[in-house]
Amino acid sequence: MLSNSIFKLGEVIMTDLKTKIRSLIYKALTPVGDYFHFSLDFRVYAPAVKTLIGRLHPVESIKPLIRIGPDGDGGYLLPDDLEGIVACFSPGVDVESRFEMQLADRGMELFLADYSVEKPRFDHPRFHFTKKYIGAMDHGVFMSMDTWVNKSLPNDAHSDLLLQMDIEGFEYETIFSMSQSLLNRFRIIVIEFHSFERIFDKQFFKQLNRVFDKLLVNHSVVHIHPNNYEKTIVVKGIDVPPFLEFTLVRNDKVHAGKYVKKRRHPLDQDNVPLKKIELSPIWYRE
């Protein structure tokens, strides 16, 4: 009996010791993994990642793509289908606002939000600024998309809208918390997604899958632009830029099943003057 008890105690001690050693190794190697873009978390198999990317293959929009905004960073490609869109909601105010300026010059009301700045760099009679971060809830310096839209357009619950969002990783919780009825009002959605290089991390992969589950209910991807601010990583033969700019269009405005063939649109421009990034064929239905 005594020997059994000692044996069991030894097992417990060894199990605890192994757990502590694994924890120490994880903590020590995690910064190294962050630097070299690998993770110690549970990994996703390449076929699952390819399946997700396959859902994101761009289809052709009914109207041709045009470029709105400046050359380089801050300019985006979206369909030439802006007539009838009453307002653009643009969370995340940077030093660059020419995308918003050009839309305002076309007669669109522009609603901007960001707690980190006092006001947009440029002024325009159609600009309406809210000093709040946009996120999952209404609390403190945060406001949800539904609350923001309802307060901005209190007498309009049906008009088409445009969403342009670059909020440094908060796009995920913002999309999750947005009502489907509001999401459906956005004829055009332009989002920069961050941390795409984590697509092989199991938890992030689940989050990414669920985000696009929601976005693709009534929208389709029509354009993907890799932001070349950081270099592309390659895992299991799959190229993944950390930052990807997606243009999505409501399904009544696309040619369903007609996929884009060109990997780089003639109007695409590098965000910064570094090495060019071109997405590989895996990102397109060829």
Describe the predicted segments one by one.
Residues 66-140:
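SAM cofactor-binding core of SAM-dependent methyltransferases
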Residues 86-87, 160-162, 188:
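Structural motif
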Residues 167-169:
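Switch II (G3) loop of P-loop NTPases
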